[in-house]
């Protein structure tokens, strides 16, 4: 009964002020629904976030880490992973259906949803038309933990095939640090030069890390 009474607080707050008014602890408590013996759901949610550092840390955790939380089993782990996957697919659909790009923030959120948590470097390209509306996006290259081989010709071939006029490049750093390497800068320059011959514009190259990002355009490098 105590857990149910505690849960009414986030629910009532959500109904009155909207879901965005909930704190991370309250949002997680709403999902968990019940606590464990001797621990109400809000306390459990607070401890989980403290253990994992943030919602990001929680949603990207592995089962070995998650199973150490007393009273929380594989079912809740599967549900949390399902939430993360739902978010990724939501941004995937939103990117296709809400063209043109609504804002740099939406682009970044989409890329974070697609690349966060990947164990290998993935190089993605968002293809845009002359009005900067999204045509499609594609994971063109996949590499290792700290390297991905990128071929500008493949990018250009795909752009020509779908009649794209502009590109947004993106890749992830599984290490968590989003700061671009020298190799990242060099391949970006190569892609830009190759695209110029085909009258293709590279609007940005965004590097996704663990809870952080770097935009070449924001840095003034493009």
Swiss-Prot record:
InterPro entries from the UniProt entry: MPN, RadC_JAB, RuvA_2-like, UPF0758, UPF0758_CS, UPF0758_N, UPF0758_YicR
UniProt domain MPN: residue ranges: 100-222
Keywords of the record: Hydrolase, Metal-binding, Metalloprotease, Protease, Zinc
SUPFAM superfamilies attached to this UniProt entry: RuvA domain 2-like (SSF47781)
Keyword Disulfide bond in record: no
Residues binding Zn(2+): 171, 173, 184
One of the GO BP terms on file: proteolysis
GO terms for MF: metal ion binding; metallopeptidase activity
Residue ranges of the TM segments: none
Motif residue range(s): JAMM motif: 171-184
CDD domains: MPN_DUF2466
Family: Belongs to the UPF0758 family. YicR subfamily.
HAMAP family named among the record's database cross-references: UPF0758_YicR
UniProt protein name: UPF0758 protein YicR
Naturally occurring in which organism (per UniProt): Escherichia coli O1:K1 / APEC
Organismal lineage: Bacteria, Pseudomonadati, Pseudomonadota, Gammaproteobacteria, Enterobacterales
